[in-house]
UniProtKB/Swiss-Prot annotation:
SUPFAM superfamilies: MFS general substrate transporter. Belongs to the major facilitator superfamily. LplT (TC 2.A.1.42) family. One of its GO terms (molecular function) is lysophospholipid:sodium symporter activity. It is a multi-pass membrane protein. This is Lysophospholipid transporter LplT.
Length: 400
């Protein structure tokens, strides 16, 4: 079975399509579950401060399990790892449905998500190679963003109708993802026979961090993707603060619609990157990264809804064009040095650490009373400067 997969590297192979379907259902469940669980917290009269804590336990699972999930992904067939990880998500969602403390259930979902991520991206490099890997990443990102859009809306709409029905729908989505994983052919483990002692696994993970950081291309990818996803999460919270101030709109729906425009743009940008960027021309994505910051700063000055929608769509397009080639570069180079699973686990550690750091700085700015518009302008300028510095650094490294 594995041999047939290795010879059929088409991005439309049965194995690849199964991965994409499983990813869509799993990401759909993740996003629907967030809004359904938030509705449950409100219905059970949890305090307002508990809502960000729910996101923190999810992100915290990524950071806590980062030293171990990469080795797990590389030590077993990645399709089976994905199936078990989705099973953990299913157990967490089902537990919340049955009355388990929502923070406990959501933590279990976070552990499943942490284990799932290195396997889902690592398997792309085993099902296809070379320039097709960029296209496969584009498909993965497009399915993820589509799931984010549909899952977020479905979770909110169903929760308004019936909270338990929304939670059951999330569990069914995870069950569908488990079923889709069964159709992924069983591939040979990438790096079997590694030590399972916690000390050895931790040491191995941090050795992988060092190896990837010392390589100019993978260091470039790690920093770029970390900056992008950290900025993306911060922008989501910034919109909630910015909309009432800049647009005078106080409902809860408008920030959600604006976030949706970013997601739609990412799908378009990811598709463009798949056609226009190869592993040999990854640096083509860097101007898009700089422009993200520029457009965020311009967006922050808007006072009308239509230009805001258009600029956020553009931000998403630039973001998709920027991040997809960087993901593909890390998978290809990481697979050859530390294993794709370990490479993605290191990437997850960097991205989630960046999320916590940027959200912390954002919260500090809000706490000291910096206006929302000023935060947006400063955020955009700093992001553009950071990506420009990364590009200059990468070009200097390449010239040595």
């Amino acid at each position: 079975m594995s041999e047939s997969v290795r010879t059929n590297t088409s991005i439309w192979s049965k194995g690849m399509l199964s991965v994409i379907v499983a990813q869509f259902l799993s990401a759909f469940g993740d996003n629907a579950l967030l809004f359904a669980t938030l509705a449950l917290l409100k219905a059970q009269f949890y305090p307002d401060w508990s809502q960000p804590v729910l996101q923190m336990v999810f992100v915290g699972a990524y950071i806590l399990f980062a030293p171990f999930v990469g080795q797990i992904a590389d030590s077993f067939a990645k399709g089976r790892v994905m199936m078990v990880a989705n099973g953990l998500k299913l157990a967490g969602a089902a537990g919340i449905c049955l009355g388990v403390n929502p923070f406990v259930g959501y933590t279990l979902v976070g552990i499943g998500a942490a284990a799932y991520s290195p396997a889902k991206y690592g398997i792309l490099g085993e099902l296809t190679t070379g320039d097709k890997l960029v296209k496969a990443n584009g498909l993965m990102e497009a399915s993820t963003i589509a799931a984010i859009l549909l899952g977020s809306v479905a979770g909110g709409v169903l929760a308004d109708w019936h909270v338990i029905a929304a939670l059951v729908a999330c569990a069914l989505a995870y069950a569908g993802a488990v079923a889709a994983n069964l159709f992924i052919p069983k591939l040979v483990a990438a790096r079997p026979g590694q030590s399972w002692r916690l000390s050895a696994m931790t040491r191995s993970f941090f050795c992988a961090c060092v190896v990837l950081w010392r390589n100019g291309e993978t260091r470039f990818s790690l920093v770029g993707t970390g900056l992008f996803w950290g900025a993306g999460v911060t922008l989501r919270f910034l919109l909630v603060l910015w909309v009432p101030v800049a647009l005078g709109i106080t409902d809860n729906a408008t920030p959600t619609y604006l976030n949706a425009m970013v997601a739609v743009g990412i799908v378009v940008g990811a598709g463009a990157a798949a056609k226009l960027v190869t592993l040999e021309t990854v640096s083509r994505c860097m101007p898009a990264g700089i422009l993200i910051g520029v457009v965020v700063a311009i967006f922050s000055l808007q006072h009308a809804l239509l230009p805001a929608y258009a600029l956020l769509l553009l931000i998403g397009m630039l973001g998709g064009f920027f991040v997809v080639p960087l993901n593909a570069l890390l998978q290809e180079r990481g697979k050859k040095s530390v294993g794709a699973g370990n490479a993605i686990a290191v990437q997850n550690l960097g991205e989630n650490s960046a999320m916590l750091l940027m959200l912390g700085l954002y919260s500090l700015a809000v706490l000291v009373g910096v206006p929302a518009v000023a935060i947006g302008i400063g955020f955009g300028v700093l992001f553009a400067l950071a990506i420009a510095a990364l590009w200059i650094w990468q070009r200097r490294q390449a010239s040595y």
